[in-house]
A protein has these predicted regions:
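Extreme N-terminal starter segment of soluble prokaryotic enzymes
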Residues: 1-4
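Active-site-proximal alpha-helix that buttresses catalytic centers in soluble enzyme cores
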Residues: 6-68, 95, 109-115
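A short hydrophobic/aromatic micro-motif that marks alpha-helical segments and, especially, helix-coil
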Residues: 23, 126-127
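Short amphipathic alpha-helical/adjacent loop interface patches that line ligand
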Residues: 35, 120-124
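Glycine-rich phosphate-binding loop signature in dinucleotide/nucleotide-binding domains
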Residues: 42-45, 127-132
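Phosphate-handling substructures
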Residues: 64-121
Length: 132
């Protein structure tokens, strides 16, 4: 079995330096073009495609695979950044952002890196059980 993971293309929040987390922002034109370019080069012979239900991931998916039959799964949704969601990254110190990146700090109301690891690992195990 071959498994390919594709991250969503550039979103408006990526471009603007805003914490997205679970916010349902759209791709930029640059992001859509990048995903379409990937779609021109990637093999499209897949048995199954899974996708996060967020708008930016769906837009990336359909730019690459316009007619994809897809299973949406909340377990592969982006990490919740709690109170940081929809705020400018520059509002937080570099040190605090680095601690978050390393999984040593969780924003108030946010999801721990351990929680993300568990739900994503559960997803991967389920997929491998189903197709192995």
């Amino acid at each position: 079995m071959n498994v390919i993971f594709i991250r969503h293309a550039e979103s408006e929040y990526n471009r603007d330096g805003i914490w997205a987390g679970r916010a349902d922002c759209s791709l930029t034109d640059k992001g859509i073009k990048a995903a379409q370019k990937l779609g021109e080069t990637i093999d499209k012979d897949f048995d199954v495609i899974y996708c996060s239900p967020l708008k930016r991931t769906k837009q990336t998916l359909f730019a690459i695979f316009p007619e994809a039959k897809t299973i949406y799964d909340d377990r592969i949704i982006e990490i919740s950044v709690g109170e940081w969601e929809n705020t400018k990254k520059e509002l937080y110190s570099n040190e605090l952002r680095e601690l978050f990146r390393k999984g040593l700090y969780t924003p108030p109301g946010g999801e721990t890196h351990s929680d993300v690891d568990k739900r994503v690992c559960d997803f991967i195990e389920d997929v491998f059980e189903k197709f192995h």
